[in-house]
Amino acid sequence: MNEAIEPLNPIAFQLGPLAVHWYGIIIGLGALLGLWIAMRESEKRGLQKDTFIDLVLFAIPIAIICARIYYVAFEWDYYAAHPGEIIKIWKGGIAIHGGLIGAILTGYVFSRVKNLSFWKLADIAAPSILLGQAIGRWGNFMNQEAHGEAVSRAFLENLHLPEFIINQMYINGQYYHPTFLYESLWSFVGVIVLLLLRRANLRRGEMFLIYIIWYSIGRYFIEGMRTDSLMLTDSLRIAQVISIVLIVLAVAAIIFRRVKGYSKERYAE
């Protein structure tokens, strides 16, 4: 294999002058599947069927905007010189941590307005959010981004990857670590773990906090392999710092809520 390898077309189809990118389609698919799972579970937990539809109508656009703002803020030198690029979200460049912040804030405000338990909503949504993240990483794959350091083709073949993944990791004459795949698989496993934990009937809020811990552990280690990380300093990756902070806060929240008796209600209640 050599420079003749052609990458997959990031554009799915054209609607007149409008190019519809696989990136957006894949993220949309992840959101729809996540919504379907959350709706099924919410009915079992005594919530109205449309609760998560109403929430998602606000949460998804706000999360995407926050994810973009987060990314642009840490790449401001580039975007200050190219302001027209700020709105070109279809090219990639959204940060999951920024989206998570937007989604949590939206969920909290929504729960207050609707007089619902924030923790109950968050617990139900946790597997859906992680599923959306797992699927969404394949949008990065189509854009040939969120990859790791340079590797040999033999290394990728030893991972027994399908040929289409190996070929897509051939970028500008070099093969790269498919870190998008590592994070996607980690997230898919996390979805299974969370679905199994539903049977344990954990204290309310702990399902969501375990999701935070699970995702952050994987993100910390995988981020260290990436070459396109947002950097706080020359050697400090923002996502790794945020991941550590989230792990500490989530563990502390579980302990604090148990000690103070704030988590007496169970997931199924």
UniProtKB/Swiss-Prot annotation:
GO molecular function: phosphatidylglycerol-prolipoprotein diacylglyceryl transferase activity
Spans traversing the lipid bilayer: 18-38, 52-72, 89-109, 116-136, 177-197, 205-225, 236-256
EC number: 2.5.1.145
Residues given in the record as a 1,2-diacyl-sn-glycero-3-phospho-(1'-sn-glycerol) binding sites: 137
Recorded metabolic or biological pathway in which this protein acts: Protein modification; lipoprotein biosynthesis (diacylglyceryl transfer)
InterPro entries: Lgt (IPR001640)
Membrane topology (UniProt): Multi-pass membrane protein
Keyword vocabulary terms for this entry: Cell membrane, Germination, Membrane, Transferase, Transmembrane, Transmembrane helix
A cellular-component GO term for this protein: plasma membrane
Subcellular location, principal: membrane
Coiled-coil portions: none
UniProt GO BP: lipoprotein biosynthetic process
Compartments in which it is found: Cell membrane
Record family assignment: Belongs to the Lgt family.
Role summary: Catalyzes the transfer of the diacylglyceryl group from phosphatidylglycerol to the sulfhydryl group of the N-terminal cysteine of a prolipoprotein, the first step in the formation of mature lipoproteins. Required for spore germination.
Name of protein: Phosphatidylglycerol--prolipoprotein diacylglyceryl transferase
Organism: Bacillus subtilis (strain 168)
Gene: lgt
